[in-house]
């Protein structure tokens, strides 16, 4: 299977800029940030719940503990939240306080209900098409994140 394309910093900025032109700009940017800034897979983003990222006193957590039903491979994992992503999550909850109140609900929703890994993949395809990045996939964010960490010497 062909590996997902790694995006340059300029291409990532282009995708974020394209998000700003969409109807649900804040939500779409958060999805892009979760992929590119934490390396989360589409299925993990789709399965995120508010309680996974917010404490009982509405503070953004330093790490997301994903259980085995939320991940690929049927085993749990911890996703660390960097400063930039933490700031974006806090801004998102400040702008949409009703989302923060519904701790058991999915973090990201469509008008028809919860996202699925397939709808996340379709959203990425749409955003990459708008940004004129034809070979990128929903996995490009994860691959770009991991490649950047590797280049910085993180193992």
Model-derived features with residue positions:
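Basic, Lys/Arg- and aromatic-enriched nucleic-acid-binding interface segment
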Residues: 9-38, 42
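Flexible interdomain linker/hinge and immediately adjacent N-terminus
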Residues: 1-13, 110-111
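Conserved tyrosine-mediated DNA breakage-rejoining catalytic core shared by Y-recombinases
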Residues: 47-76, 80-85
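C-terminal catalytic core of tyrosine-transesterase DNA break-rejoin enzymes
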Residues: 37, 144-155
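N-terminal core-binding DNA-recognition domain of tyrosine site-specific recombinases/integrases
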Residues: 4, 23-26, 76, 114-119, ...
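C-terminal catalytic core of Y-nucleophile DNA break-rejoin enzymes
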Residues: 70-90, 103-124
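Short, polar N-cap/turn motifs at the start of nucleic acid-interacting alpha helices
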Residues: 52-57, 134, 154-155
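Catalytic phosphate/metal-binding cores of nucleic-acid and nucleotide-processing enzymes, i.e., regions
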Residues: 1, 48, 114, 134, ...
């Amino acid at each position: 299977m062909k590996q997902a394309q790694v995006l340059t910093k300029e291409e990532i900025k282009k995708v974020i800029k394209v998000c700003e032109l969409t109807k649900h700009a804040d939500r779409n940017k958060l999805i892009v940030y979760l992929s590119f800034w934490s390396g989360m897979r589409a299925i993990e983003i789709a399965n995120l719940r508010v309680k996974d990222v917010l404490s009982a006193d509405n503070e953004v957590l330093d790490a997301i503990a994903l259980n085995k039903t939320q991940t690929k491979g049927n085993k749990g994992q911890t996703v660390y939240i960097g400063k930039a992503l933490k700031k974006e999550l806090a801004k998102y909850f400040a702008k949409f306080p009703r989302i923060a109140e519904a701790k058991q609900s999915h973090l990201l929703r469509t008008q028809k209900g919860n996202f699925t890994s397939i709808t996340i993949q379709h959203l990425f395809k749409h955003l990459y098409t708008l940004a004129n990045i034809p070979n990128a996939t929903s996995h490009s964010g994860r691959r770009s994140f991991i490649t950047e960490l590797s280049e910085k010497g993180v193992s």
